[in-house]
Amino acid sequence: MKLTCMMIVAVLFLTAWTFVTADDSRNGLKNLFPKARHEMKNPDASKLNKRDGCSNAGGFCGIHPGLCCSEICLVWCT
């Protein structure tokens, strides 16, 4: 009986501790949606479309097509 009561108290304490230390996420999605809507209107604003560090035509790529902006690599970007 004592062990059961101690387990119940421990679970309640840990549950309360989780709620007290959690981040306030009430406005999390509210701030996310306007940014997503802006990226849908302007696809160039999306971070996924940006290719930082890619080589233009004539740049050395070895055999890794991911290094070229055109994704075509034959030792040199084409």
Curated annotation (Swiss-Prot):
It is found in: Secreted. PROSITE patterns: DELTA_CONOTOXIN (PS60005). GO terms for cellular component: extracellular region; host cell presynaptic membrane. Keywords: Disulfide bond, Ion channel impairing toxin, Knottin, Neurotoxin, Presynaptic neurotoxin, Secreted, Signal, Toxin, Voltage-gated sodium channel impairing toxin. Expressed by the venom duct. Residues 23-53 form a propeptide. Residues 1-22 form the signal peptide. Disulfide bonds join 54-69, 61-73, 68-77. Its main location: secreted. One of its GO terms (molecular function) is sodium channel inhibitor activity. The keyword Membrane does not apply. The presence of a 'disulfide through disulfide knot' structurally defines this protein as a knottin. The cysteine framework is VI/VII (C-C-CC-C-C). Delta-conotoxins bind to site 6 of voltage-gated sodium channels (Nav) and inhibit the inactivation process. Belongs to the conotoxin O1 superfamily. This is Delta-conotoxin-like S6.8. It comes from Conus striatus. The lineage of its organism: Eukaryota, Metazoa, Spiralia, Lophotrochozoa, Mollusca.
